Design a protein with these regions (language model features):
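Broad, structure-driven detector of short, well-ordered beta-strand segments within folded domains
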Residues: 1-4, 85-87
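Gly/Pro-enriched, hydrophobic low-complexity segments
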Residues: 60-162
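Flexible, processing/modification-adjacent segments and terminal tails
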Residues: 3-79, 106-109, 160-165
């Protein structure tokens, strides 16, 4: 899990099972990602992003609009790298059914990460995908099934603080 309080990014080291602060580059990139909450397309122009309709494309048997979203560059290994994501919106009801982005670091660098979304359900007037998969394109992916969504719960800010002990 990755935790971010707005200033400090940290997670649990899988080997030691101890909390570890992230390096500055990771923290800076998480700050950029916070610009996208609750959605990358919300106010995209004022964030300096650009969106381009690539055209219609069939994705997993569904006709979609393929949109290229170019966001503020991320820093990877000390260099600014383009942050480009492709979204596939169902042409019938305009919900995203897939997201593809190039992996820019680590052992999977150069491969395409793919997230698929389905089983949209309404929660307090908003639609959310209750079924998702995430993985490398054209390889087995990890499923995520959501049982329920609670909007705007009260969460103690201390949950996000790095444990000092």
């Amino acid at each position: 899990a990755q935790v971010f309080d707005g200033e400090v990014s940290w997670g649990i080291n899988m080997m030691s099972q101890q909390p570890e602060k992230s390096d500055q580059e990771t923290t800076d990139n998480l700050k950029l990602e916070n610009n996208d909450f609750p959605d990358s397309f919300m106010d995209y122009k004022s964030k300096g992003y650009s969106a381009e309709l690539i055209g219609k494309e069939t994705f997993d048997g569904t006709e979609t609009f393929k949109i290229k979203l170019t966001k503020e560059p991320k820093t990877i290994d000390g260099k600014k790298e383009d942050d480009i994501t492709f979204y596939f919106f169902d042409t019938e009801n305009y919900v995203p059914i897939a997201i593809q982005t190039m992996i820019t670091q680590g052992p999977s660098k150069g491969m395409t990460m793919e997230i698929t979304m389905s089983d949209y359900q309404e929660v307090e007037g908003l639609y959310f995908p209750f079924s998702q998969t995430q993985g490398i394109k054209d390889q087995p992916s990890l499923p995520l099934i959501i049982d329920s969504i609670e909007l705007n719960p009260i969460i103690d800010e201390n949950e996000f603080k790095f444990p000092e002990n």
